[in-house]
Design a protein with these regions (language model features):
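Blade-level signature of beta-propeller repeat domains, shared across WD40, Kelch, NHL, RCC1
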Residues: 401-442
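Short loop/turn segments that connect beta-strands within beta-propeller blades
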Residues: 131, 190-194, 234-238, 278-282, ...
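Hydrophobic beta-strand positions that form the internal "hydrophobic ladder"
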Residues: 174, 218, 259-262, 303-307, ...
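A flexible loop/linker signature enriched in serine peptidases of the S9 family
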Residues: 167, 178-185, 201-204, 221-230, ...
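Amphipathic beta-strand/beta-sheet edge segments enriched in Tyr/Trp
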Residues: 96-158
């Protein structure tokens, strides 16, 4: 099952209440699977990448292994960007002469030096257009022993933004659910799988993390009081507090782009419906009114539309509606089971999990419902896709190596990288870039 779907189903069975059992049987029943006309794109050629010549970083003065350590972080960031093919070269002693035959090639040099004052060290990074010999980026970053990784992430993102006009994702984080035994907790890690740390410590079931646009808060569902309630976790303070504890389901949170509203699923009226709850928790607006299940809401980048999953056609399908709940219409017309939609930050694509012959795979399609392309295949269940902030990557959970873990891939399905390994991990949610974060909470 889809990770939002499967995890919710298992959790609802534990809750063992009438409304939860109704929800589970309605949306997670196993019916016949229809044939589809979804294009399989997994064999397609990946987007063309630009050559990047990454020089060995120099060290000046007593800086120890920092140059090699920093370069290793930068190299991984450049590779994971999906933009560059990285080649290792030796550093230059002088500015290189222009070489028009190498149009599109970029050379990156770096030097670590002792710092002064509060900064123990300085990193001087340069990016050069090999064809013209012009310096595209020349910047110095102060750092200390504990901030080398984030300094390299910032440098790589600066290079990406300078060369492509689109900031990279190296400074972002991913929230997810990790299961150990019967306990499910919320965890957070760097985008590359490093610095994994546990967020909740409730010894219960925590599911469906969602990032606030300002990047220091998570919404999630927890069963720690018996009912599936929505809580908010302040990552700065390290504390959680209840947001929606209405009777029945309080699940599948998703923040509006301005942070003023949280879309979610509530069953307080006896049926699972999509609601908008104001960030101050004072106002709740019901958007759907059906005798079926509506769940998994996700906002468009403009905040004017909401995509969601509904089984109103007889099986789970992706629908879209205006933020007021009007103009509800079907998006997916291929396949008998489509769930967990996510709108790309650029707004032109969506991704979701689709079941074919009992197996879940990730589909990417145009936001208007056309051109569905299957980007995973022959690798276990692949579920809960979520876009990176630059729309170039998708993070997802997969059972391709046995138990579910978090993986990352390019938006065309290429360059798959495993990010987690301990426990069983699913429900990934990609956080905002620092420069995208809202300065003021909604």
């Amino acid at each position: 099952m889809g990770s939002n779907s499967a995890s919710r189903a298992r959790a609802l069975l534990v809750a063992a209440t009438t409304v939860l059992a109704l929800f589970s049987s309605a949306i997670f029943s196993s019916g016949p699977v229809a044939q589809t006309d979804v294009t399989t794109g997994i064999k397609a050629t990946s987007t063309m990448k630009s050559p990047l010549l990454l020089a060995r970083f120099r060290g000046e003065g007593p800086v120890g292994a920092l140059p090699s350590q920093g370069r290793a972080v930068a190299r991984k960031d450049f590779e994971l960007s999906g933009v560059f093919n990285v080649a290792d070269v030796e550093p230059l002693d002088a500015k290189p002469a222009p070489d028009p035959s190498l149009a599109g090639n970029v050379r990156v040099e770096g030097t670590v030096q002792p710092g002064d004052g509060a900064a123990f060290f300085r990193f001087h990074g340069v990016a050069i257009d090999v064809a013209t010999g012009e310096v595209a980026l020349d910047r110095t970053y102060p750092f200390n022993d504990g901030t080398l990784r984030e300094t390299m992430h910032r440098f790589v993102d600066d290079v990406l933004e300078t060369l492509t006009g689109e900031r990279g994702i190296a400074e972002t984080k991913i929230a997810y659910v990790r299961q150990d035994g019967r306990v499910k907790e919320i965890w957070v890690m760097d985008y590359d799988g490093e610095n994994q740390r546990q967020v909740t410590h409730d010894r219960s079931l925590a599911l469906s993390p969602a990032w606030a646009p300002w990047g220091s808060e998570l919404a999630f569902t927890t069963f720690k009081r018996g009912n599936p309630d929505l809580y908010l976790f302040d990552l700065t303070r390290g504390a959680s507090y209840p947001f929606s504890t209405r009777p029945g389901l309080n699940t599948a949170p998703n923040y509006s782009p301005d942070g003023k509203w949280i879309a979610c699923t509530l069953s307080r009226d006896g049926n699972a419906e999509i609601y908008l709850i104001s960030r101050d928790a004072q106002t709740a607006k019901r958007l759907t009114r059906n005798t079926v299940i509506d769940t998994s809401p996700t906002f468009s980048p403009t905040g004017r539309e909401i995509m969601f999953t509904s089984n109103r056609t007889g099986s789970p399908q992706v629908f879209v509606m205006d933020v007021e709940g009007l103009n509800q219409r079907l998006v997916t017309i291929e396949g008998s089971y489509n769930d967990s939609p996510q709108w790309s930050p650029k707004g032109d694509k969506i991704c979701y999990a689709a079941r074919h012959d009992g197996i879940f795979d990730v589909i990417v399609m145009d936001a208007n419902g056309s051109n569905p392309i299957q980007i995973t295949a022959n690798a276990g269940h692949n579920e809960n896709p979520h876009w990176s902030p630059d729309s170039r990557k998708i993070v997802f959970s997969s059972s391709r190596e046995g138990k579910r873990q978090i993986f990352m891939m390019n938006a065309d399905g290429s360059d798959v990288v495993r990010l987690t390994g301990d426990g069983e991990c699913f429900n990934p949610a990609w956080g905002p870039r620092p420069k995208d974060k809202l300065a003021v909470k909604g």
